[in-house]
Each structure stands twice: as C-alpha cells, then as structure tokens.
Amino acid sequence: MKTRILIILTLMATDSVVFAQSKTQKTAKEKTAMAKNDSTVQKNDIMLFGEIGETVVTGYYSKTKNSFTGTAVQVSGKEMMKVNSTNLLEGLKVFDPSFQVVDTRGIYGSDPNHIPDQIEIRGQNTMPDISQSNLQTVTTLPVFIIDGFEVNVQKVYDLDINRVKSITILKDAAAAAIYGSRAANGVVVIETITPMAGKLQISYTMNGKFEIPDLSSYNLMNAAEVLEFQKKAGVFDAYREGEDAGLNANSYNVARRAVLSGVDTYWLSKPLQMGFQHKHSLIIEASPKTSLPGGTKVRFAANLSYSNLNGAMKGSGRDTYEAGTKLIISNHRIRVTNDLQFSMVDSKESPYGSFSSYTSALPYYQEKDADGNYYRMLSLSNLAPEGIALGVLASMQSPVYEARYLNSYSTSRGMNVTNNFGINWTITDDVRLKGSFSLSHDSDRDDAYVSPGSFEYINNNSSITPDALYQRGKYTLGHSSSTTVYGSMLTSYTHSFGRFDVQAILGAEAKQTSNESDSYTMTGFLGNSQDYISYAVQYEKYGRITGGKSKVRTAGIFCNQNYSYGNRYLCDLTIRMDGSSLYGDHQQTTPYWSAGLRWNVHNERFFAGSSVVSKLALRANVGTTGNQNYNRNQASNQYNYLTKVYGGYFGAIITTLGNPDLKGQTTYNRTIGLEASLWKNRLNLEFNYYNNKTKGNLTSITVAPSLGFDTYKANMGDLRNEGFDFNISYSPVRTRNLLVNVTLNGTRNHNTILKISDALQRYNDMVNANGSGSTTPVFQFKEGESMNTIYAVRSLGIDPGTGKELYIDRNGNTTYTWNAQDQVPVGVNEPDLNGYVGLNIRYKSWEIGTHLNYSFGADKYNYTLHQKIENVNYMTNNDRRALTERWQKPGDVALYKAITDNSATKATSRFVQHEKRLSMTSLRLAYNMDSDRLRGSWISMLRLSITANDLFYASTIRQERGLSYPFTRSVTFNAQVNF
C-alpha cells in the first residue's frame, strides 16, 4: 500500500497559500532507479521550501519553483542590501535587466524627490498620448504588492529595505494573469519579514551615505574659450542695423580684460554640495516560548525607521518616517494577522532651481560685486569701468541670486496609514480558506511660494500701480487625499491521487478608491518674508480654486488550477473576470486567462544518476493581461458650468467626450523557458523567449478646440514586444571558507507597432507636413516601426566648401534644404543586449562583490550635439566642441556647421550615434563578525559594510546627463547589530 504525504505550508508574511508537490513513496525498484533524483526533489520541495529561490510568491498564493509554469525573478532582502541599501527600485535593475526605470535623456539624475513614473518590464506596451502635433508623456508602472496588498510606487520608493524579506517580479501571463486588468506592465511582489518564533530579537541598522556630484559628462568651455567662441561667431561684430562697431568693441575688450585678469567662474559648483543621508532602522520581534491555552501562539513585531537625506543640490532633501506593528495569533487551525503601518515623507526642492541654469552661465562673469553682494543680473556692464559705453551686454539672470536673497520654496508632505488584516482557516488537510481586508488612507499637501522679488516679476519693478503690486509674489497650495478599501476571499484545495496532484484556488476581491484634490494660487505678497498664503492679497488673476473628486470601483473573480503527474508533467490554468467603473458603458467586464505547461526533465527515469545535470526543466505559457491607464471621466461625457446666467439658467459646455466603447487594453503573452542546473548546482541558468502583443492600445488624442472639448480617449493601436532574457550563475570555488560566484544576465527587447488607427495616421501626416515646429526628433506612429524609432532627415554631413549641411531628400537627391516630409527612420533606441555582470567572493567572515552594467547596440539622438554645439545661444556657455569642431573656413572637414551660422538645425541623422556603455553599479566590502567572538555578549550578530554605487560611467556617446539635477556617485557605510 502506498503512503501519501501531503505538505501544505503557509508564508506568514503574506498569508498566502503555498502549494508543495505531493510525494508518493516509491516501490523498491523505483527507489533504486530514482534514489538520487528523488533525494534532490524532496530537499527542494520540503527542506528548503521557505527559502528564497525555491518558492515563488505571487501575492495571492505561493508555489514551489519546480511547479511554476511562469517567469519570475526572485531577490531576497539580504541580496538587495548588498547592491543598494537605500533605493529598492534602482537595485532591482541589477537582478532583472528587463526591469527598466526610464529616464531616456537622464534629465532627473539623482534627484531624491523624483518618483519614477515610467517603469517598463519587457518593453513599452502603452502608446504615449498625443496632441495635435507632438508627443506627450504617459505614466507606465507595474503593479506593486506589499504583503498581498497593492500600494503605489512612492510607497515602494520610500520603503525601508531592512524590512524586506523578498521581492518577486512576475513577468508573463502564467505568473501575472491572476492580476487581470492590472498586470500588462508586470507585477512586483514584496514580502516583508515576519516575527521569529520563540525568541526576542532586536535589530538595529544604521546607514550613512555620502553623495558626490558627478560632472564628468559636462565638457563646457572656460572663460577664455567662451570669449574666443563668441569672437569667431561674430557676437561682437556690428552686423545688425543700428549697432555701433565701437560700442561692440568696448564690450569685447571689457570681457577680454576680465578673462586676462583671471576671472573664470565655475558655475557648476555653485548649487552643489556633498549630499549626505543618515538612516536608522529598528525592528523588535517577540514571541513567547510557551503557547497560550488551547495551543495558541502569539508573534509580535514592531518597526521604526527614520531617514534624513540632504541632496547634492543645496537645499534639496527628503525625510521619511516609518512606524508599524505586526501581530500574528495562531493555533493548529486558524491564524490571524494584523499589520498596521504609518509613514510620512517631507520633501523640499532646491531653491537653486534647475541645474541647467548653471551649465549656461558665462564663466567670465563673477557671482559677487566688490562688496561681496550677489549680482541680480550678470552683464558686461558689471565688469566695465565707470563711464565706458557698451554695445553687446550679454545679460542673463544670476542663477544664484534668488537662492541667496529670496525666500522662495517648494515643499510637500505626504502621510499614509494602512491597516492590513488577514485570517487563514485550515478547514481540513486539503481545504483552506483565507480572507483579507485592507484600509489605507493617503493625504498630501504641496506648498510652492515665489517671492515678489523673483525674476518672474522683474519687469514690474518700475511699476507702482496697485494692480501690478497685487500680482507680485505667488503661493500655490494643493491638497489631495485618497482612501482605499479592499477585501478578498480565497479558498484553496490540494489533493493527491497517487502520482496525480491537483491544486486549485477560487477567489474574489473588490476594491474602492476615493480621491479628492484641490489647488489654488494666491498673489499679492508685499514682502519677501511674507511667505505664507495668508499674507496674499487676492486670487491669481483670472484664477479660481480647482480640484476634483472621483470614486473608482473594481471587482474580480479568479480561479487557478494546477495539475501535476509525478512532479514531471505540470499544467497550470488561470481564469479571471474583471469589472471596473473605469470601463465604458458598453464594456463593463473583461476576461483574462493563462495556460502553462512545465516538464521537469530531471525527474525522468532516464536522468536518474546523472552526475552532470541536477535540474532541467522546460516550460511554456500563453495568456492575456490588461491595463487600466486612464481615468473614469474618459469613458463618459464631462461638462463645465459657465459663470454667466442666460434666461435665469447657467449654461454648460462639454469638456470631455466620453467613449462608451472604451475598454481596457489587452496584452497577449507567449513565453517559452528553460531552467537548468549542472555539476551539483555550480552552474545555474535560465533562458526565456517571449512574444507579447498588445491590442486596443489606449491613447489620448488632443483635438481642435472648435470641437468643444480638448481630448478623448480611444483604443487606437496594436503593439508587439518580442525578445529574450537570461540569467547565469557559476560558482567555480565552493568550499567551507571560500565561495566565489559569478553572475551574468541580459535582455533584448524589440518593439513593433502592428496597427494604427486613422486618427494616428492623421497625426503622422500633420508632423510630416509642418515638422511640429520642433527642432528635435518628433515621435511618429508607423506600422512596422518601433515605438523607439528615431525619425530625422538623412544627412551627408557638412559641405567643406560652404559649412552648410547636405541632406538626402525622400527621392534620394541631395539638397541644402531641410524638409519635414523627408524624415525617415534613422535609428532605434533599443540595445542589442543590456544586462549586468556580477562577482561575489566570500572568504571566512569577509565578503566583496561588484556589479557592472553593460549595454550595446542602441541608437541614440545626441541632444548635446544638437543643442550645445549647434542651435546654441551665443550668449550662454556651451560644449567645448562648439569652438573646436565647427566649420570655420572653406576646406574645413568638420562635423558641425559653420560657427557663424545661427540658423536652427532640425532633426538630422548626423546626431544619431551607436552606443556602447559600461558602468559600475555597485562595489561592496563587508565583514560579518564571527559568532564565537560574540559569545557571552548580548550581541547575536554584527555586520559592517561599505558600498559604493555608480562609481563610473563610460559610454561611446558623450552627452550631458542630469540637466535638471546632477547624477551622483555615492558611498554608503552600513552597520547592523542584532541583540
């Protein structure tokens, strides 16, 4: 008689149902044939079942990796701490290169207050919104789940990594289809630590991070070079009607005298400092060693953390506070969990403004006068001796004046309170019931004050009319709040029929989110120190209070079934039906599904006794996921009441044309994968190929105001993302005292537009007809091309005889005239391969590790060449190549047009470059104090480490990075002690 052993485990942190494969005892003959294989399988499924890498946490339930048909990347909290201990989103890129935090031009740098609003997993599957002639940004984010409950990206951005037990990225239909209409951009599931049983433990962690601004991408001219450039460009020549050659000569001589006297102001350093962050985390875990009456056990944990960050730009900062408790009460049948968390974030923007202002300031200007006062305006008149008349003044606003003398500021405060409650009931050995309830409230306040002495009002300085005075100074105050109520019920069934295992889940959930917001602007501040809104005289001219109120309800039912035969052949099915108030009246619900297969080849008899292959599995899955990237008012008509009365009634105008046929876009996912482990798990590899097609892409179209409304939302295009990703790890040395591990991962994704609507084609025609008025490349929707395709006019380079650019028109002829209709695809901003190489060495109590990011094959449009070498403002500083590499005389073979040519350069293939990039993401050294040394003390564990992030960045494309806020290199000191 065969004995059946059924294992059902539960992950305490998420209250998720965990499925393990049932084991059936073998006959003597089977034991002999498969002894080694079964030993490995049972170890994976039982002994190591709770370890990261052996259990896939989906948020609703968990499965052993050997029974999972989907694609998931798993990272432990400890592994994340080794790469980046302060920014979880940046750290995830190291473990999964298909997880991309998008900042295409590197605008935001290391701004601590920039919350990523575009994160892609396996490519872009959402079309951007468009106006009548240009591209608009769109927010694309994966779903973030913490302990089974959905949270926003800011919650993850500010999360204390010390609380994290594991992170799982779900990337295909079999992994994420159970999330239905939310899963098209992927799912990130975070599991926090749970109290340890039978002991009291106190853990304290301190991080101290130094940030050093990285200005290596800037190649600006010094004072002498700027003056030489301006001279050669004819800035001081009297070529305009009415200009006086003598006065212009005076201007040049004044600037030259300043240069010869040694004036060479390095403006880039003025708003910068060494940033510093100190972060403290305290976690207390308690659990009585003895059970309460009835076998009831209690576990309790409390967490408290504080982070103070002063950014690399003076005055910028971000303070975060977290506090919470987790209580678990359980017996042999029922377990109740309650998790209460509070968080608060205070942020402030730098009063020094955008960093790009400092990259433009002329270095032959001084920031202070002879008395040490900061200049309000930078001009040659500041340098000229008294009585000297000037022509060209080259005036510009001092970028430091407002920060030094005025009291303008921009701050925000956000608070969140969340309570998650869960109950698990083990009804029988085969049947379990799980219920969850969550209540979350967010409130935010934004304050922005502009002093009446700001440059914004400089033109009114001479005016003393009351109306002009009442327009000086501005205070904008905004409030927003959001309350989310969520509930779910899930039942699971697991049974084994000999070698045939059946696992099933049936669940339902509902969520309601209520949002409110208001904002208004007041003006008329009579003094710089009157920096609160109550000092204002009136509302902004023609202004009023704006705001909104909305309520979104969603509900879904889902079913997941898993069938397994002998832990060799597995089939996984998921079905979900979603309903949402976001949908149009004609499309109230949308179905989603997935089907997956897995073959554990290593469990076959013909693999028994293999000394090389310890694991080999093939899997494939298909299915659908969805996206709800729009608001409720886009499915119904919206009106605004007019303020004037006609016939005793208020009139109304339509502001939004509703689309009753609007439905969530659907992505059809197809994935095949391979998993293998060789030589006793020394070599582990995973490879996945995917082909995802998104149908009915949601796009906002901005239309002519004459229609009576501004925009409408429609399902207007189909996309495909095709590619592969892989992960390889190898341990050449694995002894008791020495462990060496090498990792390599990579990804390639190609995006293709399959179908566009007539409205999108009209947008293309409009762009090609007039060039949209932009000098830089404009996005176009073209079937067969990528969303990342660069459109420009083909160029033959600069004519050595004239210094003008030669173009190739659409008929193949050469011409000096740029025409928008000649724009063609000239490159695709998609790397051939992007990934990370890692090396980790552990020797006794010491650890050292590093990760390098590589990328090659992408075409990029070099905006620095376009805007800081050509299309330059001659009265500002520019890239040094504007002086050294622009055409100056007939016969010059130059990359850039004539130095005296100040006409606008438009999108051209000259500025498209092929990139190869290598950067060091992290370098870490750690020491773990031997437990023998700590014996007899209150300390049970002591770990010290130092981690450097972003130490270098090397690229074949040289362009400025961090234009709004500079990038930084950071060094973090970490100390963790457990009592």
Language model: regions and residue ranges:
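Short, acidic, small-residue-rich periplasmic hinge/interaction motif at the N-terminus
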Residues: 22-81
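Residues embedded in well-ordered regular secondary structure
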Residues: 65, 71-74, 78-85, 95-120, ...
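Conserved small-residue
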Residues: 203-260, 519, 714, 731-829
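Extracellular/periplasmic, surface-exposed regions of secreted and cell-surface proteins
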Residues: 320, 326-334, 339-344, 390-450, ...
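Extracytoplasmic gating/loop element in the C-terminal half of outer-membrane beta-barrel translocons
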Residues: 456-458, 855-942, 948
